[in-house]
Amino acid sequence: MASRFPKFSQGLAQDPTTRRIWFGIATAHHFESHDDITEERLYHKIFASHFGQLAIIFLWTSGNLFHVAWQGNFEAWVRDPLHVRPIAHAIWDPHFGQPAIEAFTRGGAPGPVNIAYSGVYQWWYTIGLRTNEDLYAGALFLLFLSVIFLIAGRLHLQPKWRPSVSWFKNAESRLNHHLSGLFGVSSLAWTGHLVHVAIPESRGVHVRWDNFLDVLPHPEGLEPLFTGQWNLYAQNPDSSSHLFGTSQGAGTAILTFLGGFHPQTQSLWLTDMAHHHLAIALVFSIAGHMYRTNFGIGHSMEDILEAHVPPGGLLGRGHKGLYNTINNSLHFQLGLALASLGVITSLVAQHMYSLPPYAFIAQDFTTQAALYTHHQYIAGFIMTGAFAHGAIFLIRDYNPEQNKDNVLARMLEQKEAIISHLSWVSLLLGFHTLGLYVHNDVMLAFGTPEKQILIEPIFAQWIQSAHGKTLYGFDILLSSTSGPSFDAGKSIWLPGWLNAINDNNNSLFSTIGPGDFLVHHAIALGLHTTTLILVKGALDARGSRLMPDKKDFGYSFPCDGPGRGGTCDISAWDAFYLAVFWMLNTIGWVTFYWHWKHITLWQGNVAQFNESSTYLMGWSRDYLWLNSSQLINGYNPFGMNSLSVWAWMFLFGHLVWATGFMFLISWRGYWQELIETLAWAHERTPLANLVRWRDKPVALSIVQARLVGLAHFSVGYIFTYAAFLIASTSGKFG
């Protein structure tokens, strides 16, 4: 007899209902719950899956390069980056006849194509790629890497090549290799690529494998490095009249500290970025030699943590016990990694538009909007995941004996104070912000806009001024034109920085007013409420006043029966589930704010944002309704146009989003009743009843249905806004 799915759980494989299928899929990667799992096998499976993950990433990036080289217009775009629309790939089968073919034949392509809003053209152009051959070479190399990683993953599952558990728990070696090897060496390699390939290419010098040993990246060669005259590498930078990709106005510097942006490309100076990566390489290479491994020198992580008892006794036993707690809990490690990665991803979103690193990307408005929104949503999911795994750690891996009176134990002891503080902050922010918005709405409705409560964000303006923004007239630090720091700034360090801050056409230190003040506090409300739900879920995961034995029920449980009353919706999983709605809501406000602020900046009518963003009807009417007109006109009685696909995606996104409520509102009793009726009808319908199944159909569990509902809500929500964002931006700016 063939073994039934799932092989990893014999108990589940013998389940006579459809629960076997759905629960089998849901727990396929939940290695901890599998029948034959040991600690060693768990580490090996995770290790192998990392190789698989890397293989998929390289295959995906290889596919991007390959399709652009094959079906794109990279070489035409390189000749005129500001006017040629970059093509992502061809559309094989354009439905809806001739109008569709005409609508989607763009960018000089022979047939229907998709336009790229990912910024890959600008990225590849900046790093020195110029021809389709370059793209094909990159695609082949990444494909090769992908295969190597797949083989490596398979290899490390073989008995001879399996690392031991002690290898996985060797924190010092891992830190050293990640700091020096991953960050240090890769940053150094990237500096090398920028200096040897990208910077020469930006000056019209073509460096490839056939000539890279003959072309000096700097006229002085390595002499300044060995004689200590490093300042020579910063002399003679590109001039403000430099035409990117040509020798006109080009300099010879390779490592500079200019600040600001290249006037033509509106992106950071390549020579500044090379300098930055070299500095990062140096710092991380040194950092990767700090921890004690083979030679008995350097720091021991455990010694540091054990010794770190804060003075005054206010934090108890400090970090005692933390080393073994973290090192033996994969969920704790994953929680820390996700928290870090989430913050970094959000920082990427903030920095990619304010300090654009890629040539001409700042003038590709739809790409700017798409990249910001994309990275913020990803950051949101990663950050909520951090708290989810933190809660799982507290339920499954936390040992109170091992952590007596250390900072972790004290967090749990003080959880009521933490949770109640987050609660009052959320209430204060929510009621005050909504109160101000609604007051302003009422004043507008009664025709007395002058009675609005408009608060200038003077503290934020003061901070902007201290960094050099002169508009507000604060005359402080770098905005004081007569001050010594201002004078030094022009000559000694970052001469282009102050110019960039005071250029009102970019997104660096955007001018802010009462509308920004209000939406800032609305976003703060969302952030604090999301944090409240997540922190409460994690801190109460082991037990609460209402349910002291909660940890015995695991991470996700629907209720503990009717007898105890009030135990529904209080598992740590439920907190994560609720927090995701708040996270999406918050990022909605963040992206609305970013997008509206920027489309008015790009269109040259910032007054619209400034005047309409101080009341809710302004947001609904002048942002959402006004900018959805492109979607509403995606197709009309006269046929379709190039925005039609976004109009359909907008509708489809709403459909997926609304489907989520079907799972969220009606619970399993309703579905079980419906299933029984449908099964009865099926068995009595000719022809249909020729199809039989072995598993008895049962409804999803409450927790499963919530997950399915949440997934539809999230996907639909993001699809809807993505279509709105891309259509409204590309409809205005092409």
UniProtKB/Swiss-Prot annotation:
Q: Where does [4Fe-4S] cluster bind?
A: 559, 568
Q: How is the cofactor bound?
A: P700 is a chlorophyll a/chlorophyll a' dimer, A0 is one or more chlorophyll a, A1 is one or both phylloquinones and FX is a shared 4Fe-4S iron-sulfur center.
The record's SUPFAM superfamilies line, in alphabetical order, gives: Photosystem I subunits PsaA/PsaB (SSF81558)
Coiled coil region boundaries: none
- Membrane topology according to the record: Multi-pass membrane protein
Q: Where do the TM regions start and end?
A: 46-69, 135-158, 175-199, 273-291, 330-353, 369-395, 417-439, 517-535, 575-596, 643-665, 707-727
Gene3D superfamilies reported for this sequence: Photosystem I PsaA/PsaB (1.20.1130.10)
Q: InterPro entries from the entry?
A: PSI_PsaA/B, PSI_PsaA/B_CS, PSI_PsaA/B_sf, PSI_PsaB
List of residues binding phylloquinone: 671
Chain positions recorded as chlorophyll a B3 binding sites:
662, 670
Q: What is its main location?
A: plastid
State any GO BP term from the record.
Answer: photosynthesis
Q: Does the keyword Transmembrane apply?
A: yes
Subcellular locations according to the entry: Plastid, Chloroplast thylakoid membrane
Gene Ontology cellular-component terms for this entry are: chloroplast thylakoid membrane; photosystem I
Catalysed reaction(s)? reduced [plastocyanin] + hnu + oxidized [2Fe-2S]-[ferredoxin] = oxidized [plastocyanin] + reduced [2Fe-2S]-[ferredoxin]
Which EC number applies? 1.97.1.12
Query: Pfam families per the record?
Result: PsaA_PsaB
Q: Where does chlorophyll a B1 bind?
A: 654
GO: which molecular function terms?
4 iron, 4 sulfur cluster binding; chlorophyll binding; electron transfer activity; magnesium ion binding; oxidoreductase activity
Report keywords, A-Z: 4Fe-4S, Chlorophyll, Chloroplast, Chromophore, Electron transport, Iron, Iron-sulfur, Magnesium, Membrane, Metal-binding, Oxidoreductase, Photosynthesis, Photosystem I, Plastid, Thylakoid, Transmembrane, Transmembrane helix, Transport
Q: What does this protein do?
A: PsaA and PsaB bind P700, the primary electron donor of photosystem I (PSI), as well as the electron acceptors A0, A1 and FX. PSI is a plastocyanin-ferredoxin oxidoreductase, converting photonic excitation into a charge separation, which transfers an electron from the donor P700 chlorophyll pair to the spectroscopically characterized acceptors A0, A1, FX, FA and FB in turn. Oxidized P700 is reduced on the lumenal side of the thylakoid membrane by plastocyanin.
Family, according to the entry, reads as follows:
Belongs to the PsaA/PsaB family.
Subunit and partners? The PsaA/B heterodimer binds the P700 chlorophyll special pair and subsequent electron acceptors. PSI consists of a core antenna complex that captures photons, and an electron transfer chain that converts photonic excitation into a charge separation. The eukaryotic PSI reaction center is composed of at least 11 subunits.
Query: Under which name does UniProt file this protein?
Result: Photosystem I P700 chlorophyll a apoprotein A2
Q: Give the organism, scientific name.
A: Pinus thunbergii
